[in-house]
């Protein structure tokens, strides 16, 4: 899978690719990432990339001619993703859709963002949350990480991402490791029992409990299994 990240600050992106699983995936040729400096397409001697907004207002806006010149150099691509707080929510489902593509272009803005006409050249406009960052680089890296980890071979155990939060529509169950007791807090006995069916039941139950407590809106639209539906009914009776 190939990525092109277009940004005014390439040195914010490159170090992220030099650590951990992304570094290994790059070294093994499982993914390719090109980081494009938007300023290389700037205008004039000073490589100008932005201008004041029509109609007045604070801040500067990235020019469409500069942004599209950088974008067209990266084409062809399966998807052109513009990162913006005004975009549709980036979810695990969207990550799975994008992970099936061969080439993604990620447009990371700055200042007041891109001239609105740049949206005409994007296939998707995505947001990673209802808040505003100083630039789109963190959002672009979130999309890159969430999709790259779904590429076969990037994560050693394929079961790992099949059990992630949101894959089944619920949050993940709580995880524990050694020691079995820490400052009076014990690991649930069922996890030490070696009884696989009971462990699975506990995990499904705690995933439901955690989701109800932290993200109750997810439960209403999650495709619950028969076991999860029974567990949910039991929890309702307990209340």
UniProtKB/Swiss-Prot annotation:
The record's keywords, sorted A to Z, are:
Cytoplasm, Methyltransferase, S-adenosyl-L-methionine, Transferase, tRNA processing
Q: Which GO terms describe its cellular component?
A: cytosol
Q: What is its EC number?
A: 2.1.1.228
Is 4Fe-4S one of the keywords? no
GO terms, molecular function: tRNA (guanine(37)-N1)-methyltransferase activity
Cite a single GO BP annotation: tRNA N1-guanine methylation
Q: Which domain of life is it from?
A: Bacteria
Catalytic activity of the protein: guanosine(37) in tRNA + S-adenosyl-L-methionine = N(1)-methylguanosine(37) in tRNA + S-adenosyl-L-homocysteine + H(+)
Q: Where in the cell is it found?
A: Cytoplasm
Q: Which residues does the annotation say bind S-adenosyl-L-methionine?
A: 109, 128-133
Q: Which InterPro entries match?
A: Alpha/beta_knot_MTases (IPR029028), tRNA_m1G_MeTrfase_C_sf (IPR023148), tRNA_m1G_MeTrfase_TrmD (IPR002649), tRNA_m1G_MTases_N (IPR029026), tRNA_MeTrfase_TRMD/TRM10 (IPR016009)
**Under which main EC class is this enzyme filed?**
transferase
Question: Quaternary form?
Answer: Homodimer.
Protein family per UniProt: Belongs to the RNA methyltransferase TrmD family.
This chain's function reads: Specifically methylates guanosine-37 in various tRNAs.
Quote the protein name from its UniProt record. Answer: tRNA (guanine-N(1)-)-methyltransferase
Species whose genome carries this gene? Thermus thermophilus (strain ATCC BAA-163 / DSM 7039 / HB27)
Q: What is the lineage of its organism?
A: Bacteria, Thermotogati, Deinococcota, Deinococci, Thermales
């Amino acid at each position: 899978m190939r990525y092109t990240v277009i940004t005014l600050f390439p040195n914010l992106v490159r170090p992220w690719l030099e650590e951990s699983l992304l570094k290994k995936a790059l070294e093994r040729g499982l993914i390719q990432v090109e980081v494009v400096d938007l300023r290389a397409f700037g205008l004039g001697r000073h490589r100008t990339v932005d201008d004041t907004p029509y109609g007045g207002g604070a801040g500067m806006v990235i020019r469409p001619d500069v942004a599209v010149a950088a974008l067209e150099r990266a084409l062809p691509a399966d998807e052109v993703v513009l990162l913006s707080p005004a975009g549709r929510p980036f979810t695990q489902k969207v990550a799975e859709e994008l992970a099936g593509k061969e080439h993604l272009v990620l447009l990371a803005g700055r200042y007041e963002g891109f001239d609105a006409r740049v949206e005409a050249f994007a296939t998707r406009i995505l947001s990673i949350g209802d808040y505003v960052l100083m630039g789109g680089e963190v959002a672009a890296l979130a999309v890159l990480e969430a999709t790259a980890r779904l590429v076969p071979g990037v994560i050693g155990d394929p079961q790992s991402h099949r059990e992630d939060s949101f894959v089944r529509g619920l949050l993940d169950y709580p995880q524990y490791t050694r020691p079995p007791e820490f400052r009076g807090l014990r690991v649930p006995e069922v996890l030490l029992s070696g009884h696989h069916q009971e462990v699975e039941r506990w995990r499904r139950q705690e995933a439901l409990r955690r989701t109800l407590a932290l993200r109750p809106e997810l439960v209403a639209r999650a495709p619950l299994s028969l076991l999860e539906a029974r567990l949910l009914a039991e929890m309702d009776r307990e209340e």
